[in-house]
């Protein structure tokens, strides 16, 4: 049974979900498939050299509503899951709102974040496939820690191509990588053809998640002893993240609540998708729940992108993904919320947005960090950069609810700042933070590739 103590709602470990949820099976519309270079839907055979068979099944199976969480994965999850939920009464009082604010704290994992939710099953299935190692790309310390810890659990070697442009954040990620024995390579690197090309083209102060993924993907295609892992975007990562939404659903039910608004920041969208997915069936059945994705204003894939097929990586090596995108050639500015610097949004989330189940807004650094500071001073949790964007929109919505005089329930997740990330408020409090706008020339060039398509 769930336990309610003051503002805190906790689940008994026995109540942790034993199956992940596949929302695609319940959707009243078809999510377009990834496409192979041949122009046909990608097949299991084409993915087999890169991914374990269980990951491929989760990726391509649109009919199974649930997937079993393996015993070994569940045991690893139980180190920190279920995670707690809180009623944000102090923030409600600060805002004078009639809204009821509930936030789930995704922390306590070895990575300090929700990214372990998908790193662990990907590493487990990689080991089960008989591979020696796992290779991936990402945006700094949290994913490095997540994949490093997961690989160490199952006796795998690990390599992460980490975005060079993140500078000091990446350096802290490198340090955490050493703890877990990760071989961290600054991307673009000299290890791959993709990396060499991008380094020559853009120089040392460059890099993007798309380039890091391209390097990892290239290495995986050339080394049969490793499997490729991805932190977000693909359907299997969203399925793994549904453990967050499933727990949240049970915690709200324990206090007889259901959300009127579910709000979350978005990079490629798997965590946001995992949070909202268990609440989608009620929306399909008629409940008017709003789902709001919050973008960084310099990486506005939903609010300014186009819906088309585009590669997940900068070099176009990976399958073509149906998504809202700014184009793989877009080079976003180096904002502190590095995980939000991606050129596209997960196919399921993109389809939900296209079908009007999801709304999207974009916020800048200063307004988001200012909102994060208000949350920290009210609730006592120092937030990670991307969580501040969530909180910014939560505060905006809470004030709108106040104006309406209703008592809407708002659900969101936060992750605390961890040592692998930058000190989150220094530049704001020092008065040197500035908002990053989309790099219009890069955006125009990247989106120009899609003119006349479709």
PLM regions: where:
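Positively charged, low-complexity intrinsically disordered leader regions
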Residues: 2-131
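A short, small-residue-rich loop immediately preceding and capping a beta-strand
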Residues: 118, 126-165, 258-271, 386, ...
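Alpha-helix C-terminal capping segments
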Residues: 121-131, 145-157, 178, 276-285, ...
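Active-site-proximal loop->helix
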Residues: 135, 142-204, 301-311, 422-431
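Glycine-rich beta-alpha junction loops
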Residues: 189-192, 233-236, 266-270, 295-300, ...
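Glycine-rich ThDP/TPP pyrophosphate-binding loop and its adjacent helix/strand module
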Residues: 202-215, 225-281, 285-288
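Active-site/ligand-binding loops adjacent to catalytic centers
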Residues: 205-232, 281-284, 288, 293-381, ...
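Claisen-condensing/thiolase-fold acyl-transfer catalytic domains that form or cleave C-C bonds
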Residues: 266-274, 365-432
